[in-house]
Structure formats: structure tokens, C-alpha cells
């Protein structure tokens, strides 16, 4: 992580720009360390990813402060970075029980547009362990939610799904389905 420096990252990004990609995505580690700061500095858009837990939302709020004050765009007085909120590991039942923040709570704290809500799902761990992106699992709620978020990022209008706990029907409750 200490091998990163601003000039080196800028050089790599400029080379990628010359290759005429539609998008250059710089994933950064959680927290506010060198890798994250380098990605933030050069961002034109930022997908701020957080969990509905107080500590994660606080970290995301600090990231938003850095985007607004210490990015290249901020230093040069350019148009601000376009920010998007991606809420992951969301469990409506846990929200109902007061165990985690709601989508509304997180939106109120961070005050940036909601891009997507990814439900807590065993398919995420399964895909990660298989080395495959969960978005390719079209049967999973998480895969579908990531697909929705990407579509919204590209300008498509999609309703938000997986925000309410699925109510089991009578037969499912009776037979444990």
C-alpha cells in the first residue's frame, strides 16, 4: 500500500484514458488509507459503499468529506465529484428489529443519491469463494440488486427491490419452506 504515490496513479489512469475505455473503475479498500485516498483523489464519480451499521456509515461520511475537500476536482475548483450511495448487506428483518440502520436513516445521514441496496445474502459469500461476481447469479437477490444498481448508474430507471422482509406464506410457514 505504501508503493502508491499520486504521480504513479495519475500515470496509470492517463494511460487507461488513452485506451478509450468507456469507464475506468478504481476500487479502493475500506477505510481511509493510501489506496483509498489515491482512488478518491482522481475520481470523477464515486460509488460510496457502506453497510447499514453506524461505524460503516461514519466512515462513509468521512469519505464524502474527503471527496468534497481533498480530491483533484476540489483542489482545482472543478465541478464536484458525482456521488452515489450503494448500501450493502441490507437485512430488512434486522432493520425492523432495530438491529441495523434503515435505508432512510443512511440516506438522511449521508445525503447523497441512492444507487442501490444489496440485500444480505449467502450467495455473495458463495460467489466470492468461487471467484465469480455475484452479479452473474441471476437467481440471487444480491445478483439482481447489483444488476439494478449498474443499470441505474448507466441512466436506466429501475425500482428499488429487496427493501422489505419477504413474508412467508401459510404453507411455507407450516412446512418450514
Residue spans for each PLM region:
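Conserved short-loop catalytic and cofactor-binding motifs
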Residues: 1, 48-51, 134-137
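Glycine-rich oxoanion-binding loops at beta->alpha junctions
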Residues: 3-7
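Conserved catalytic-core segment of NTP-binding enzymes
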Residues: 8-11, 16-23, 28-113
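C-terminal lobe/tail of nucleotide-utilizing enzymes
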Residues: 74-177
Amino acid at each position: 500500500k505504501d508503493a502508491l504515490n499520486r504521480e504513479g496513479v495519475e500515470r496509470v489512469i492517463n494511460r487507461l484514458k488513452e485506451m478509450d475505455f468507456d469507464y475506468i473503475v478504481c476500487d479502493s479498500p475500506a477505510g481511509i488509507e493510501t489506496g483509498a485516498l489515491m482512488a478518491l483523489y482522481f475520481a470523477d464519480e464515486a460509488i460510496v459503499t457502506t453497510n447499514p451499521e453506524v461505524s460503516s456509515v461514519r466512515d462513509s461520511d468521512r469519505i464524502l468529506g474527503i471527496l468534497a475537500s481533498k480530491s483533484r476536482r476540489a483542489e482545482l475548483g472543478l465541478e464536484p465529484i458525482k456521488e452515489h450511495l450503494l448500501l450493502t448487506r441490507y437485512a430488512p428483518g434486522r432493520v425492523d428489529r432495530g438491529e441495523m440502520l434503515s435505508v432512510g436513516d443512511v440516506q438522511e445521514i449521508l445525503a447523497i443519491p441512492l444507487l442501490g441496496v444489496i440485500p444480505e445474502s449467502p450467495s455473495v459469500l458463495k460467489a466470492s469463494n468461487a471467484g465469480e461476481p455475484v452479479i452473474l447469479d441471476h437467481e440471487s437477490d444480491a445478483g439482481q440488486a447489483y444488476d439494478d444498481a449498474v443499470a441505474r448508474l448507466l441512466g436506466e430507471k429501475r425500482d428499488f427491490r429487496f427493501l422489505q422482509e419477504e413474508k412467508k406464506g401459510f404453507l411455507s410457514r407450516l412446512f418450514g419452506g
